[in-house]
Each structure stands twice: as C-alpha cells, then as structure tokens.
C-alpha cells in the first residue's frame, strides 16, 4: 500500500498526524507477521519511521485488550482510535534512514512510529505485511510481550497461491496483506 505522511499538520481542515508508537501485533494478533517498508524518495532523520529496538522484549502498557478493529471500520464512532495506543517510551527511538528502493523488513512486534517534519516535503513509502504459514504451523513468531487482543485478523491477509488456506491445515505459502484492508 502507498503511505503518504504530509509535512503539514492540517490538510483541508483535517488534522493529519503520522502514526504514533505502536506494535502491529496489537491489532493483527499475529506474532509471525513481518512488515516490509520501502521509501520512494530520500528520507531524513526527521522525516522517516522510528523504531525502539530496546523495547522489543519490553512489555508496554497499551489498550490492545479493548481495541476493536470492527469498531474502527464500522464508522459509527468518528473518534475511534486508528490503532491501539501506548505511551511513547522515554528513551529516544532510532530513525530509519535508508535509500529509496531499499527495503526494510522488521517484525510486526517491533515498536515503531512515523515522523514528519515541517520541511514542506511529504514522505512517500510503500508498506505491506506478510505471514509465512510455515511459521504459523510450526508455532514460530516474535515473543508476545504485551499484545492482549483476543482476535487474530487473518482476513487482512490473502494467500497468493493457495486461496482458502487456513493456518494449521496442510499446505504452506506466504500470506500477504490483502488489497481491501
């Protein structure tokens, strides 16, 4: 999916913010999920994504136990949070500055956030998520240190070569993020 992070805080009267600190596993509930991120234009350490490597195995208070994807997409609550929330760690995050066309793969359990600056330059990147069913079938995945959601959102992923494959059943393949998400 194409992600655009404007350098302005407001566009057409809407407040636009980069995504705050979060783990994607808080929403997906899938510990074996891998995120792929590719910038399309040059980055700076103030216009990029940041990660907190030291928080990978550190539990963080969050509201993943009560956050509900179905409530988000229902549109009934215009102020419903886009993702589970936490308090940003006191330690500084590490900015990711890679070249356009380089690809960053990282665990969905990695705490990360978006950054934008007032340079007037918007950030354009491509991101997607994948799950290898062999990892699921073998019980492999990142340590779940603090995700408390009760639902695994397999509907976010589509098997590219094995339509209808359900984790835990015979067959192996990579599940990639669905177009409709």
Residue ranges, per PLM feature:
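Conserved double-stranded beta-helix
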Residues: 1-44, 49
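Double-stranded beta-helix
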Residues: 46-107
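Extracellular structured ligand-interaction cores
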Residues: 31-37, 46, 93-95, 111, ...
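Short, solvent-exposed loop/turn segments at secondary-structure junctions
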Residues: 9, 42-44, 56-57, 109-112, ...
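Generic recognition of flexible, low-complexity loop/linker segments
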Residues: 24-25, 92-94, 112-115
